[in-house]
Amino acid sequence: MPDSVAGMTAHQITLGAFNLEAQNPALLAGFWAAVTGATPSPGGESVYLPASPGGFAMFFQPRTAPRPEHQASHLDLTVPWGSRQAEVDRQVGLGATFQWNVLEEHPHVQWTTLADPEGNLFCVAEHPPADQQ
């Protein structure tokens, strides 16, 4: 497979936005705005959440089909080592729901799985410094 196609190379690809279909796009965008610190930009029934510095953009649009039973992908949010629990507590206070912790299974990461107000799973992860792995 070629490294470049029409002058584009793989290292030029970035994440443009994480898109979510929502029962209530404005409400869900409000939750994620509080999590990320971004300011929502509504446009009709959809809401765009621009990327904060070093972050990612999100786009919320009305659900077009029934919600699938299994979520095929999810966000992993990374926080500095030692701050995961405080961030989890903050997000639960914003409306997330605690699901489970994974703290001992992997030496290079600990995470907590949460659900946003519409039930979409996401994780808050922390990686220990290299000398503690």
Report each predicted region and the residues it spans.
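Vicinal oxygen chelate
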Residues: M1-Q23, P40-P42, Y48-Q61, P66-R90, V92-Q133
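N-terminal first-folded block
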Residues: P25-G44
